[in-house]
Amino acid sequence: MNPLIASASVLAAALAIGLASLGPGLAQGNASGQALEGIARQPEAEGKIRGTLLLSLAFMESLTIYGLVIALVLLFANPFAS
């Protein structure tokens, strides 16, 4: 494999997982804070808020998993390597 392609693949994999985890990480923190604030304001709606929060967190985490899959493809099944 060309060393330039290998270096670029490692750099792209690092950027893919880093950037793919940055957005969902910030969004998960924000969503959790807002959910706790909502539960503090309306304790009787705790179950509904918690269910919605967990579903939202799962969708946000899927974006990070897609970044991980792209990084693994670039590292181990590189389509640009001959």
Swiss-Prot record:
Keyword Disulfide bond belongs to the record: no
Functional description taken from the UniProt entry: F(1)F(0) ATP synthase produces ATP from ADP in the presence of a proton or sodium gradient. F-type ATPases consist of two structural domains, F(1) containing the extramembraneous catalytic core and F(0) containing the membrane proton channel, linked together by a central stalk and a peripheral stalk. During catalysis, ATP synthesis in the catalytic domain of F(1) is coupled via a rotary mechanism of the central stalk subunits to proton translocation. Key component of the F(0) channel; it plays a direct role in translocation across the membrane. A homomeric c-ring of between 10-14 subunits forms the central stalk rotor element with the F(1) delta and epsilon subunits.
Molecular function, one GO term: lipid binding
Name of encoding gene: atpE
Similarity field: Belongs to the ATPase C chain family.
UniProt source species: Thermosynechococcus vestitus (strain NIES-2133 / IAM M-273 / BP-1)
Topology with respect to the bilayer: Multi-pass membrane protein
Activity regulation remarks: Inhibited by dicyclohexylcarbodiimide.
Localization (cell): Cellular thylakoid membrane
Protein name per the record: ATP synthase subunit c
A Pfam family reported for this protein in Swiss-Prot or TrEMBL: ATP-synt_C
Ranges that cross the membrane: 3-23, 57-77
UniProt site positions, description: Reversibly protonated during proton transport: E61
Classification via InterPro entries: ATP_synth_csu_bac/chlpt, ATP_synth_F0_csu, ATP_synth_F0_csu_DDCD_BS, ATP_synth_F0_csu_sf, ATPase_proteolipid_c-like_dom, F/V-ATP_Csub_sf
Main location: membrane
Keywords: ATP synthesis, CF(0), Hydrogen ion transport, Ion transport, Lipid-binding, Membrane, Thylakoid, Transmembrane, Transmembrane helix, Transport
A GO cellular component annotation in the UniProt record: proton-transporting two-sector ATPase complex, proton-transporting domain
Complex formation: F-type ATPases have 2 components, F(1) - the catalytic core - and F(0) - the membrane proton channel. F(1) has five subunits: alpha(3), beta(3), gamma(1), delta(1), epsilon(1). F(0) has four main subunits: a(1), b(1), b'(1) and c(10-14). The alpha and beta chains form an alternating ring which encloses part of the gamma chain. F(1) is attached to F(0) by a central stalk formed by the gamma and epsilon chains, while a peripheral stalk is formed by the delta, b and b' chains.
